[in-house]
């Protein structure tokens, strides 16, 4: 099929790579991409495979638009046993499915991919299959308007069946800039991110152990990878995404074990970029209420919420507030939360919305 849209942008018609990862660790040096390449925003970053300290993952989530407690997060991992702190499952390939039902009840279930993983990616999009897990995902060309991703799960052993569909609201970008070659994806030293869908319209339709999880909401898809153990690279971080009125927001405020703070921020309005930066203090995130210690320490409970302040330059700022309603995941070193979200230009109209965020604390 002739693809005039891509050719008009000076992009190649069709280039694809297919990678197979076995359910075993690579016992040598992994070569990891640390600068963006053409048409590879969502492609695998570790070659030929992950070793013990390298990880490569694809994250998808959604939180209900309504004032309900429904949410879901699905993460496809290719992670060495010393990389993200997860239990050693006998191999690096696994899928984690977490969420909350309307009544606030949370669940976390998962499956390994003992038959390996196949990932095909290129100019037409991406397809990933964690074989033996019943979990897969597809995504369309990120250079086209409103890319769409679908996560499909069919696993009788887990009792999970259904789909998550995400239609982009905001354009793709890296932590350090837009979706083009030569951009740094670094969030914090050794840890990288590519936001294929910073904000998306989500449609969720799952059956989980006989219970229905079905809603429309605010969605997000990003890719994360790292070249060293997470705990060796991060003391704490605050990350999240949300939507208020016409604005879509992504934030990252992280601290290294040495105490240096790193930032990454994005604001779009009706799909157009208002601000994108990884400059110091581009988005300052701080906890409020109980458990407002900064940075948070291992074992501390989740805070009541966060304040966010985006520096836009010329004395302008975008301010937002997240209020935790329910925790999707709780551990000594990690919290994932959903809740209400409000914000707008400082001194201007303030809007209401929804958000999902997480917190590391080592």
Curated annotation (Swiss-Prot):
Source organism of this protein record: Penicillium thymicola
Whether Lyase counts among this entry's keywords is yes
Metal-binding as UniProt keyword: yes
Q: What is its EC number?
A: 4.2.1.-
The family annotation for this protein states: Belongs to the quinolone epoxide rearrangement protein penF family.
Null mutant phenotype: Abolishes the production of penigequinolone and accumulates the epoxide formed by penE.
Annotated signal sequence range: none
Instruction: Name its pathway.
Output: Secondary metabolite biosynthesis; Alkaloid biosynthesis; Mycotoxin biosynthesis
Catalytic center at which residues? 220, 222
Entry protein name: Quinolone epoxide rearrangement protein penF
Q: List the keywords (alphabetical).
A: Copper, Lyase, Metal-binding
- UniProt xrefs under Pfam families: DA_N
What result is annotated for mutating residue 222 to A/D?
Greatly decreases the activity toward dienyl epoxide and results in only trace amounts of product
What's this protein's function?
A: Quinolone epoxide rearrangement protein; part of the gene cluster that mediates the biosynthesis of penigequinolones, potent insecticidal alkaloids that contain a highly modified 10-carbon prenyl group. The first stage is catalyzed by the nonribosomal peptide synthetase penN that condenses anthranilic acid and O-methyl-L-tyrosine to produce 4'-methoxycyclopeptin. 4'-methoxycyclopeptin is then converted to 4'-methoxydehydrocyclopeptin by the ketoglutarate-dependent dioxygenase penM through dehydrogenation to form a double bond between C-alpha and C-beta of the O-methyltyrosine side chain.
Reaction(s) catalysed by this chain, per the record, are: [(1'E)-5'-(3',3'-dimethyloxiran-2'-yl)-3'-hydroxy-3'-methylpent-1'-en-1'-yl]-quinolinone B = yaequinolone D
- Molecular function GO terms recorded: lyase activity; metal ion binding
Which SUPFAM superfamilies does the UniProt entry name for this protein? AttH-like (SSF159245)
